Amino acid sequence: MVSVDVVGAAGVPALWYILKQNQAPSGMVYSGCLILPFTNSFFTLQLMCMETGITGIREAIVMDRFIASGVSIRELSESATRFEHGTAKGHYSPDAPEHDVQFPNHPLSRVRRYFRDVLSVLSIKGVY
């Protein structure tokens, strides 16, 4: 899991999460899912972006920047073993949103950007 958040979607509180899964033969698929709960049902909107071409560039560049900043490999590996609420805590996080601006065509950046676009125009008609 990359992230999970409660967001406002057309005036309704909703759950938004992003999953990262391996794809064959290489690369990752990033899947964003918006779940809108209603009285007797729920609505799910899913958006998937796949990695194509050369993969791992975002991760390699972010890692290189952390190493260049003086963070040791040992610190990175030790921080990856610390968990808080089921999520690894540490310095190295190539999936963090702050890297999206540097990698706008990365599938994770696109999932987040498309999700913001959907939220900006989403409307719900009728009573559910």
Language-model-detected regions and their locations in the chain:
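Surface-exposed amphipathic alpha-helical segments
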Residues: 49-128
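Signature of long, low-cysteine stretches enriched in small and polar/charged residues
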Residues: 1-43, 47-55, 59-60
